[in-house]
Amino acid sequence: MKHKNIDEIKKLESLPKIINLFSDQEIKNISELYNSLPVTVHNQKQNIIKKRWLQNCNKSLDAMYISKLKEVLGEFKMDNLKSEKGEDFFGLFHESFSPLKLHVDSGFEEKDIIFKQVVTPLSPIGETIIFKNKWYGRSTSFTIDED
């Protein structure tokens, strides 16, 4: 199912950008936060560990992260999972030991206006491939396997 606000989404599209937004010390602080967070998912088949950036675990780091994103994006709303209390998580950490399958993170609700993806690598090892193709449906994974 496609998003209902496709025209608005298309107006916000731009080419991918690589921006060195965080200092080495800030990346170190985010890495330390990652190491302190509980594992949310350990998908052994895909060899991925996922953790949620819990709000208020480190309030100064929360404020720094949001402030830095606003410098680049302006005002924004995160499309994230919610805690049991209804609070937004500041994103998900993915520690991947194998390539991720082809997927799109385009929001969960058809009325959402998807905006930008922010990827913050915490190590110099690894690559992210961004395709020029567009997908205007909700978040999904792609496969040629019909089963």
Range-by-range predicted roles:
Residues M1-D147:
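Fe(II)/2-oxoglutarate oxygenase catalytic core
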